[in-house]
Each structure stands twice: as C-alpha cells, then as structure tokens.
C-alpha cells in the first residue's frame, strides 16, 4: 500500500476524575502502511488549538501507539501496553514532561482503513493529571 488520502474522525475524551470533556475532529489525512503497522498524518487547525502543527499517529504491532506533533507545538507521546514512558507534551503555553501509562490499545486497521482505540493515563511528577480515551476511524 502506498500513501493514500483518507477521511478520519478522531474523538478524544479526557477526565480528571471529576469532569469529563470530549472533542471530535473530522479531517483529511494521509494514511500509509509501515513495516510494523500503520501511520496517519494530519494538519491541526484552530479548532484543535494547535493551528500550524502536523500530527502523526503511528501504530506498532498493535501494542504501541506513538503520537508526534511538529510545527508550532512539538509533542511526542508513547502509549505502550506494559510500559511507562516519560514524554514531552507540548502545549500552546509551553512544554511538560509527562508520564504515560497505557490502559488499552485495540485496532482493526488494515490497508483499507478501520478503527484504532486507545486509553492512557498521564501524570506529572507522579501526580495524576487525567485519563485520556482516543478513538480514530479511518475511511
């Protein structure tokens, strides 16, 4: 499979234990098969708060998801089952070093698209920040 233009729907929800907030993004993206899985790349917009950035979400062997953001805001989050990763999370207000623990990763992505769902917890200096659920549909 070579790179192909696709439509994607990304639903993100986060909870800090008291409040839950959800956002939905519909966007065009570039989808491609890699040696170990699949990669999806899309441009952020004002709606996401990361205008001027490009985000890449890569699935490795169904067990690890790497979310990288480049451009006006730079981030690199690694969500891997059974491992805690310390990652740089860029925000419009500055960068944070965060701990990332995966709770769940499930994918039925194939050469025609599909769905990727993953859940993770973020902490800063071992203090709980929130639970994050991401669901991505590729068509």
Residue ranges and their predicted role:
Residues 135-139:
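Flexible glycine-rich active-site/ligand-binding loops centered on an Asp-His dyad
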